[in-house]
A protein has these predicted regions:
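Membrane-helix boundary/helix-loop-helix interface segments in multi-pass membrane proteins
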Residues: 1-23, 27-154
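Flexible, glycine/proline-enriched loop segments at strand-loop-helix junctions
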Residues: 126, 169-171, 220-223
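Hydrophobic alpha-helical segments of polytopic membrane proteins
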Residues: 48-50, 70-77, 133-149, 156-201, ...
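Hydrophobic, glycine- and aromatic-enriched re-entrant/interface helices and adjoining loop segments
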Residues: 90, 94-96, 183-235
């Protein structure tokens, strides 16, 4: 059974912390939206739904959940494909699916969790062969498909975040430092070439605003207008 939990061991303290933090978030929205009741109601509904889902998932034995690795990976690909084929477009990006009752959801956010589970299984399954080129190549190919589909939405930020997450999974899986140092040795010069090409809009898979945001992060003074959003998010 997936659900086989001793409630005496349940960490209710974490649940209380989540509720308190969510309450602070609701108050912040109440203040920022000039007490817009519709926004507050939507936020509270999302919190309740999220809490129910989080509690259910916390009761699942993750080791048994990993036995569904093929289904999990398949669901990630199917949902991302559904976004590209029939997703809702807003602001030039197609990132959302409209579901009955629930409303708009962004599958890429759930895909992060799915890929963590899948690649946790993958590198556990092939632990003894983890440093073989074929093992890493297959893992890279399996990651490339959903990553490309997220990038096509377009959603560069989520693609980068997901890449860092899966890279962390690979690092924690016990891959040899020779591979890590080798990859870094290749990435550093490639990064310099990337920045150079970025300045002259020579990166075909990046939209104009995406390139500008990256350049603003590297050189905020020269791209002060584009850096405004990043600067205010830090404040």
């Amino acid at each position: 059974m997936l659900f086989d939990y001793n409630f005496k061991r349940y960490n209710f303290r974490i649940l209380i912390y989540v509720i308190l933090l969510s309450g602070i978030g609701v108050m912040a929205i109440w203040s920022a939206t000039n007490q817009d009741r519709s926004m507050i109601a939507k936020q509270i509904f999302g919190i309740i739904l999220g809490l129910i889902l989080a509690i259910c998932l916390s009761l699942v034995d993750y080791t048994r959940l990993l036995s569904l690795h093929v289904l999990i990976y398949g669901a990630c690909v199917v949902f991302l494909a559904a976004v590209l084929l029939m997703g809702r477009t807003a602001g030039g990006a197609t990132r959302w699916l409209i579901l009955p009752v629930i409303g708009a959801i962004q599958p890429a956010e759930f895909v992060k969790i799915g890929l963590i589970l899948f690649f946790s299984w993958y590198f556990q399954r092939y632990q003894e062969k983890i440093n073989q080129p074929i093992t890493l190549a297959v893992g890279a190919a399996l990651f490339a498909l959903p990553a490309f589909m997220i990038l096509e939405q377009p959603n560069l930020s989520t693609t980068l975040v997901t890449t860092v997450i899966i890279a962390s999974v690979v690092f924690c899986s016990g891959v040899s430092y020779k591979w890590i140092l080798g990859v870094l040795a290749v990435l550093f010069p490639l990064g310099a070439v990337f920045v150079y090409m970025l300045q002259y809009e020579m990166i075909p898979f990046l939209r104009g605003y995406q390139a500008t945001r990256i350049l603003a992060w590297i050189n905020p003074k020269e791209y002060s207008a584009a850096y405004w959003q990043q600067e205010n998010s830090i404040m």
